[in-house]
Regions:
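Alpha/propeptide regions of enzymes that mature by internal proteolysis
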Residues: 1-271
């Protein structure tokens, strides 16, 4: 469906969500949309993505920021990545501990010297309840100047080995943004890193395929290759078309545009 810019799309992670309260997740999504969308007044799509994700990191509801799951040694290591489509600027962090990993990724992007920094930040933070089935968070945005941005943040896989880095801070895998499209993914990082669904959607869009068709094709290929219960994604293109898909039990998500707002939980292929 096509929306009037500026547009902000977010997700709270694809997964089973068996132990999660639906109402709390949707409330956190609405707060994220409000906080992120406010950035359009003075900032670009990049700032909208950062603030929307930071809001979800702060909530403690999702597997990101305060809600991050623990690794096999009982510690917390977080990953996040951010990309600005107009300049292909990227900032990513891996295996860090911070209240807002997406802000750390934003710092890397603004500095412009490197793309991915690992194990550079260890903040003391008050963690939330990470016993739920919350998952990776992400956002994509289109501002009134036509610029696209994408970002993703996660605490990784519960019980992972220390030092494990998933797809979330890797451009083309957990997130990607160009002048054509912005994508944020969620799911099993070890699989996403092998197929690079975010990059594949951009390639199909560059070949002239509509966004919905591109998303369905990539989701179909991923599911055919690796089975189900492993991927969800949101996508937004330069024309304001938005799309979402997942092959898991649910993927809380929402969209806010110049004219309205919607949130979803387990409704398949709706945005």
């Amino acid at each position: 469906m096509r929306y009037n810019s500026p547009v902000l799309v977010i997700h709270g992670g694809a997964g089973s969500w068996r132990n999660m309260e639906r109402d709390r997740a949707l409330k956190a999504l609405r707060e994220s949309l409000e906080r992120g969308y406010g950035e359009f007044r003075a900032g670009s799509s990049l700032e909208a993505v950062v603030e929307a994700i930071a809001s979800m990191e702060d909530s403690g509801i999702f597997n990101a920021g305060r809600g991050s799951v623990k690794n096999s040694e009982g510690g917390v290591e977080m990953d996040a990545g951010l990309m600005y489509g107009k300049t292909l600027s990227v900032g990513s962090v891996g295996s860090i501990r911070a209240r807002n990993p997406i802000r750390r990724a934003y710092e890397v992007l603004k500095q412009g010297r490197h793309v991915l920094m690992v194990r550079t930040v260890w903040e003391d933070i008050e963690m939330g309840d990470n016993s739920r089935d919350g998952n990776t968070v992400g956002a994509v945005a289109l501002d009134e100047q036509g610029n696209l941005s994408a970002g993703t943040s996660t605490g990784g896989i519960r019980g992972k080995l220390p030092g494990r880095v998933g797809d979330s801070p890797v451009p083309g895998a957990g997130f990607y943004a160009t002048t054509r499209v912005a994508v944020s993914c969620t799911g099993i990082g070890e699989l996403i890193l092998r197929l690079l669904p975010a990059k594949e959607i951009d390639m199909l869009r560059a070949m002239g395929y509509p966004l919905d068709e591109s998303v369905r094709a990539v989701m179909g290929k991923f599911t055919e290759t690796f089975g189900r219960d492993n991927l969800g994604l949101i996508a937004l293109d330069y024309q304001g078309y938005a799309s979402a898909s997942f092959n898991t039990g649910a993927m809380p998500r929402g969209i806010k545009w110049n004219g309205g707002e919607k949130v979803f939980f387990d409704e398949v292929d709706q945005l």
